[in-house]
Regions:
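Extended non-catalytic domains of envelope/secretory-pathway proteins
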Residues: 263, 268-289, 295, 301-304, ...
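Intrinsically disordered, low-complexity Pro/Gly/Ser/Thr-rich segments with frequent PxxP/GP/PP motifs
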Residues: 34-37, 102, 107-109, 144-175, ...
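Short beta-strand/loop motifs in extracellular/secreted proteins, especially
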Residues: 69, 79-84, 178, 187-189, ...
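Hydrophobic, ordered structural segments
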Residues: 157-202, 276-306, 386-418, 508-529
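Short acidic, flexible loop segments centered on an aromatic residue
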Residues: 74-102, 147-150, 185, 231-252, ...
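Conserved functional hotspot residues at active sites or interaction interfaces
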Residues: 5-13, 17-72, 189-234, 293-345, ...
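Hydrophobic alpha-helical membrane segments, chiefly transmembrane helices and signal peptide h-regions
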Residues: 3-24, 83, 182, 285, ...
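Long intrinsically disordered, low-complexity regions that are acidic and Ser/Thr-rich
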Residues: 99-144
């Protein structure tokens, strides 16, 4: 069986292009095209690359910020890297007049705000009174009347071999929002960014390329929530952006986006989505440019009095995919798990959500969730309410298009515990498997915890795994985490906090003999702390492949972990 696909490394990103899946004819499987087309899904640049470029769009950089932006840069090579970090301070756009979105569905609006729905939105004036320009398709709306606070600020850093550097954007600029452009003189640089505040923490990979479209399956502008879209244009030319949003009751195109929102060249702009799509429990989003390219992050703070609480950041998806892999998950009295699947295309998407339970010989094999998702709309499945998954049994998940219409999928996992691992984690899955994954951010310092979950989706081939810590200029094997065997179809959770004590500079590399998917959990454990960050790492393009078809065979594995040691509990 050979499902490997070559990955072409470009300065602007990575392309995993048009490779047929060669299947075993004896298995009576059809040969199918399986691609990750023109994807800027973050992948690690090879050590031999001439340069590395990363784009970290989202975060705040002032004393009143709710998502302090910190960039973590890891040099995985044996040589020093010269790195330039450019911080782009930005403004948050004020509400546009009549900011509620216009419903695209003529019958929509039954569940909306009567005073604001259906009203046409006037374009906002910019800071200096410039007139809007005519462009193809209609008027352009200048970004906002709050000018960017300062010019971009650059700092040069030398990162020693196999070392990492953390840089808060507040060290360079003061602004309501700030983005970072990270450039190095060679390959082997992996960059993540974190958002932190009293509301929680989250850490995710930055982008390795810009795009002319970005999609988000999940979002919320409910009364006790705040959703901020951060639009980062690192290029000299202006970008003109349109946006459309799927809510629980309709599809909306806010006036400021319908006319074309201008994001000036070399700037960052924050959009409080609640100004345009007010008080909606569910908001899926698509942003497309008429001109130019962007990087877009979504930051959400949820502070429900008796419900979810936490802080999350997520890079958008530049291209919907046919499959999304989630290595980790659980449903219980303490943990609520939801999946949101969004169809930004113009065709009906038939989707299956398949589950692989730990110890299936004991816990069974659940039937998949089947969804039919209309063009431009989304579906949410609450696994706690669905009832097909046994409580307190960790599992992996594959969200797959059954009719080859690509989709965007996110997992929403929340913990309402009074203490310990609690908070809100929202992430896309991985559209690829890879034999190597890197995590630049991480800590096992006091009142912190870190673990990883590995899933081997191959229905036939086991994989052997090594876990290495990149600390203090060395790449060191983690004790008791070498030559680990993950059988076909199985997953494995590893508690790094047990093996690596009190390291606040912990970066991790996971290497396997076969392609796998790896998720990392970061948690804040202090009595007054809240923070739960779960997401995939940065895969190597070498040996990357798209996932196989689901396997229904039961696996025989005993993880040996108590529930409290599981990655999300």
């Amino acid at each position: 069986m050979n499902r490997r696909i070559p990955v072409l490394v470009l300065l602007a990103g990575f392309v995993v292009a048009g490779i047929a899946l060669d299947r075993d004819p004896s298995a009576e499987e059809v040969v199918a095209e399986a691609q990750v087309e023109q994807s800027e899904f973050p992948m690690a640049p090879a050590d031999t690359a001439l340069a590395s470029t990363w784009f970290c769009a989202g975060g705040t950089a002032d004393s009143e910020g709710f998502a302090d932006h910190v960039v973590t840069m890891l040099n995985t090579t044996e040589r020093s890297l010269d790195v330039d970090v450019t911080a782009f301070p930005g403004a948050i756009a004020p509400p546009a007049p009549n900011a509620e979105a216009d419903a695209l569905d003529p019958e929509a609006g039954a569940g909306g705000d009567a005073e604001s729905e259906g009203e046409e939105q006037a374009p906002a004036d910019d800071a200096e009174g410039d007139q809007t320009d005519e462009a193809e398709g209609g008027e352009q709306t200048p970004a906002d009347d709050a000018p960017v606070s300062a010019e971009p600020v650059e700092r040069s850093i030398e990162i020693a071999p196999r070392s990492r550097v953390r840089l808060a954007m507040t060290e360079l600029v003061t602004a309501p929002v700030a983005s970072a452009l990270v450039e190095s003189d060679g390959g082997g640089l992996v960059v993540e960014h974190e958002v932190r505040s009293i509301h929680g923490i989250d850490a995710k990979p930055c982008a390795t390329g810009a795009s002319d479209e970005w999609h988000f399956a999940w979002g919320t502008t409910a009364r006790e929530s705040r959703e901020l879209l951060v639009l980062f244009n690192p290029f000299p030319d202006d970008a003109i952006v349109e946006g459309v949003f799927s809510t629980e009751d309709t599809v909306r195109e806010p006036g400021r986006f319908a006319g074309g929102l201008v994001v000036p060249g070399r700037s960052t702009l924050g959009i409080d989505l609640g100004d345009d799509v007010t008080r909606r429990e569910e908001v899926a989003a698509t942003l497309r440019t008429r001109a130019g390219r962007l990087v877009v992050d979504r930051i959400v703070r949820v502070n429900e009095e008796e419900g979810d609480r936490g802080l999350t950041v997520q890079l958008g998806v530049p291209e919907p995919q046919r499959a999304w892999i989630f290595a980790d998950g659980v449903v219980s009295d303490d943990f609520r798990e939801r999946f949101v699947v969004y169809n930004p295309t113009e065709e009906l998407a038939e989707v299956e959500i398949g589950f692989r339970l730990d110890r299936p010989e004991e816990n069974g094999i659940p039937a998949p969730v089947e969804l039919s998702i209309a063009p431009g709309s989304h579906a949410t499945v609450d696994m706690n309410e669905d009832g097909r998954l046994p409580a307190n049994v960790p599992h992996s998940v594959v969200v797959r298009s059954a009719n080859d219409i690509p989709v965007v999928a996110e997992r929403v996992l929340s913990s309402r515990r009074p203490e310990g691992r609690r908070g809100l984690s929202v992430t896309t899955g991985s559209p690829v498997e890879s034999p190597e994954w890197t995590f630049a951010a991480g800590s096992t310092a006091a009142e912190s915890a870190e673990s990883i979950t590995i899933v081997n989706l191959d229905p036939e081939v086991l994989t052997e795994v090594d876990v290495l810590a990149v600390v203090g200029g060395q790449e060191l094997p983690v004790s008791e985490m070498q030559d680990l065997v993950v059988e076909a179809g199985e997953r494995l959770n590893l508690d790094l906090t047990r093996q690596i004590k009190n390291r606040d500079d912990l970066a991790i590399v996971v290497r396997a003999t076969e392609p796998i998917v790896v998720e990392r959990v970061l948690a804040q454990l202090g009595e007054d702390q809240r923070g739960l960050s779960i997401g995939v790492g940065v895969p190597s393009p070498e040996g990357a492949r798209v996932p196989a078809d689901p396997v229904d065979a039961a696996a025989d594995v005993d993880l040996g972990d108590e529930l409290d040691e599981a990655p999300v509990t």
